Amino acid sequence: MRPILVVVLLALALTGCGIEIVSGSATPASSPPTVGSAPDGASDVPVDSTIDAAPGADDSDTRAVDERSAVSITDQFWSGWFADQGLRYVAPTVEGGYTGTDGPSCAGEPSVPGNAYYCPAGNFLAWDEDLMRAGYTQIGDAWVYLVIAHEWGHAIQAQLPDRFVSRAVELQADCLAGAALQGAADQGLVRIEPGDDEEIAQTLQAVADDYRWTDESSHGNARQRTAAFQGGVRDGVEGCLRL
């Protein structure tokens, strides 16, 4: 089977944000994710090693590369984790970006603007590109990795026994995102630089009133979300399952 994404970055120079792809290629899961409506084979295109995704910039092509990379490394981490536990892993399909209300419906419910979501009924992920753009221009590519890893966390919750799924499902998904990104970093797939959690907290606070994905009433405030993310980085998946 061909790899989901051939990553040829030796360095992805980032100013003010710190998610950096460094090496490796993703191993396809049992149900490989695909990004949006990209042509067949599009995910096999090598990534430009000169891309600089600094805060304040928003090149949609560059952001799309980061989205594919985030999908790839997150899928690879969870595929390996489930294999290590002797469990079957079913990767979610990735429908990718939409605008406004033109995203895929979930169990008959339409998509809403400013959101990213996992649909259990269809086992897929989707996100509003306006949400991605908002965080991308303020923090850089770390935002893209956070959003995708968080929604993937919901896909993981759907595959876990109920006793391991916290009542605080959104904060647990933030924790699982931290565990997955740190796990990917430990495997040499991605680099998380000091200060990323503070930058993520600042961005969560900045857009908290503007987007459904950052609505404090359902997801927790920036401080709670950052603490959950840090918990995943520090304690790994097992720590998240104790929430």
What is each model feature region?
Residues 1-15:
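Sec-dependent bacterial lipoprotein signal peptides
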Residues 129-146, 161-167:
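Short pre-active-site segment immediately N-terminal to the catalytic Zn-binding motif
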Residues 186-243:
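Long, well-structured alpha-helical subdomains associated
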Residues 56, 70, 85-106, 194-199:
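Acidic helix-start/capping segments at beta-turn-to-alpha-helix junctions
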Residues 79, 168-183:
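An active-site-proximal "capping" alpha-helix that borders the catalytic cofactor pocket
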Residues 22-27, 98-126:
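Catalytic zinc-binding patch centered on the HExxH motif and its immediate surroundings
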Residues 7-9, 18-45:
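Short, low-complexity, disordered segments immediately C-terminal to signal peptides
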Residues 152-167, 180-185:
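Catalytic Zn2+-binding segment of zinc metalloproteases
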